[in-house]
From Swiss-Prot:
Organism the protein comes from: Pseudomonas paraeruginosa (strain DSM 24068 / PA7)
Subcellular localization(s) per the UniProt record: Cell inner membrane
Transmembrane feature ranges: 7-27, 36-56, 83-103, 108-128, 134-154, 163-183, 207-227, 229-249, 265-285
Pathway the protein contributes to: Porphyrin-containing compound metabolism; heme O biosynthesis; heme O from protoheme: step 1/1
Membrane topology: Multi-pass membrane protein
Protein name: Protoheme IX farnesyltransferase 2
Domain of life of the organism encoding this protein: Bacteria
Length: 296
């Protein structure tokens, strides 16, 4: 039972979602030439880093979590795990994760994981989530790191493929997160979290959702146009983007915003999972040019 508490505080659902993303980035870069030990180290290392960030986020958010129906049962709120124990748990996970990435991958991969960790814990959790409607945008940078980490673990450099992954996953995060904020609106209002639907209303948020999905659609094409992914990936990318956009547009005449937002959220998971799978299996030879020189 005690072990279960320590598992839950690390948000296993989020860890699993990030596993799919980091694997997608890795396989896209590997192009069929998989090094099992590197893949294992990347997946386990990043999972530990993500788990650490989630634990520290729970520690930071315990004062606002008690006001939200969805989070008031978290072990850091109920006291089933003490603050000191949770902090120690989070720090141990972080040290283990970063240590494994440094040992078995490369400095760039470790630095990217560190950047995502800093953004999530230091910028998003401690400051922007509580004080700004732009918190979601800041948080999207950390949410987009897993596939980039997986990709750069193979290449050791930040090239156009890595930049495309960063754009795709950043842009995906926005409608995904806004959908959650809409169907959990009362929770966010009760906790005083100034997400866009709270700060500017659902009508404005719907406009942002449509615009971000359009931008996401354009970004997904970059992997194919840049020679990183094939036509199978392209077909799936266009299909899921158009379907997601269609769901978003129905929000303008829906009678139930919460139900609509749940549908939008659910399909966002389908969309990003489908893209991660397709980029893993439908890869192409990368172009020789790169945006940024590799790190030693």
């Amino acid at each position: 039972m005690k072990l279960k508490r320590y598992l839950l505080v690390a948000k296993p659902g989020i860890i699993f979602g990030n596993l799919i993303a980091v694997a997608g980035g890795y396989f896209l870069a590997a192009r069929g030439s998989v090094e099992p030990m590197l893949l294992l180290a990347t997946v386990i290392g990043l999972s530990l880093v993500v788990a650490s960030g989630c634990v520290l986020n729970n520690c930071i958010d315990r004062d606002i979590d008690r006001h939200m129906e969805r989070t008031r049962g978290r072990v850091t709120v109920t006291g089933q795990i003490s603050l000191k124990a949770a902090l120690a748990h989070g720090l141990v996970l972080g040290v283990a994760g970063f240590g494994l990435l440094w040992w078995r991958t490369n400095p760039l991969t470790t630095a990217l994981a560190g950047f995502g960790y800093f953004v999530y814990v230091g910028l998003y959790s401690l400051w922007f989530k509580r004080r700004s409607q732009y918190g979601t945008l800041v948080g999207s940078l950390s949410g987009a790191m897993p596939p980039v980490v997986g990709y750069c673990a193979v290449t050791g450099q930040f090239d156009a493929g890595a930049a495309s992954l960063l754009a795709i996953f950043c842009l995906w995060q926005m409608p995904h997160s806004y959908a959650i904020a809409i169907f959990r609106l009362k929770d966010y209002e009760a906790a005083g979290i100034p997400v866009l639907p709270v700060a500017r209303g659902i009508a404005v948020t719907k406009i942002h959702i449509v615009l971000y999905i359009l931008a996401f659609m354009a970004a997904t094409l970059a992997l194919c146009l840049g020679g990183y992914a094939g036509y199978g990936y392209l077909l799936v990318a266009v299909a899921v983007s158009l379907w997601w956009l269609a769901i978003a547009l129905t929000g303008y005449w829906t009678a139930d915003d919460r139900l609509w937002a749940r549908k939008l959220f659910a399909f966002s998971i389908v969309a990003i999972t489908a893209l991660s799978v397709m980029m893993s299996i439908d890869f192409q030879v990368a172009p020789a040019t790169h945006l940024v020189a590799s790190l030693p």
